[in-house]
UniProtKB/Swiss-Prot annotation:
Its main location: cytoplasm. It comes from Leuconostoc mesenteroides subsp. mesenteroides (strain ATCC 8293 / DSM 20343 / BCRC 11652 / CCM 1803 / JCM 6124 / NCDO 523 / NBRC 100496 / NCIMB 8023 / NCTC 12954 / NRRL B-1118 / 37Y). CDD domains: YlxS_C. This is Ribosome maturation factor RimP. Required for maturation of 30S ribosomal subunits.
Length: 158
């Protein structure tokens, strides 16, 4: 769930995202190593890949917008980091898991508490609903609620 600053930035940049037919995968505003970082992860819909040219164009437009909008949504100094989500993209929202299931991708899940003696599980999403998922692993099917999942990422096999 986005905080107030994140939501304000999302609202401001949404028209740019739509104009470029991009997909906002994630947006965070955090403190890292003593500095504030606004991180925007972009992709293309329908399992297409975003290009460096796409990211460069988007960065220029967002920089200009955030530098000129009044009131300034982020009045303090910060680093703007715009990139693709990458092969090991984070899975945070229900639609992220739907995307991974639709693409038949492997995911890596870290649990808060071990289940069947393990805190980390790798597999494909067999079933998915608003409360959780069933992961097909080498040990069989493992039902998990989203409350049990500490972190999930795409686990692309090369």
């Amino acid at each position: 769930m986005a905080n107030k600053t994140e939501q304000t930035v999302i609202d401001l940049i949404s028209p740019i995202i739509e104009a470029h037919n991009d997909l906002l995968w994630d947006l965070t505003f955090t403190k890292e190593g003593g500095q504030k970082v606004l991180r925007i992860l972009l992709d293309k819909p329908d399992h297409q890949f975003i290009t460096m040219n796409d990211l460069t164009l988007f960065t220029q437009e967002v920089n200009e917008l955030l530098d000129t909008v009044d009131p300034d949504p982020i009045p303090e100094a910060y680093v703007l980091d715009i990139s693709s989500p990458g092969a090991d993209r984070p899975l945070k929202e229900l639609w992220h898991f739907e995307w991974a299931k639709e693409a038949n991708e492997n995911i890596l899940v870290s649990l808060f508490v071990a289940k069947e003696g393990q805190k980390k599980w790798q597999g494909k999403i067999a079933d998915l609903n608003k409360d959780g998922l069933t992961l097909t692993t080498t040990n069989g099917r493992l039902p998990l609620t989203f409350d049990e999942i500490a972190k999930a990422i795409l686990d692309v096999q090369f």
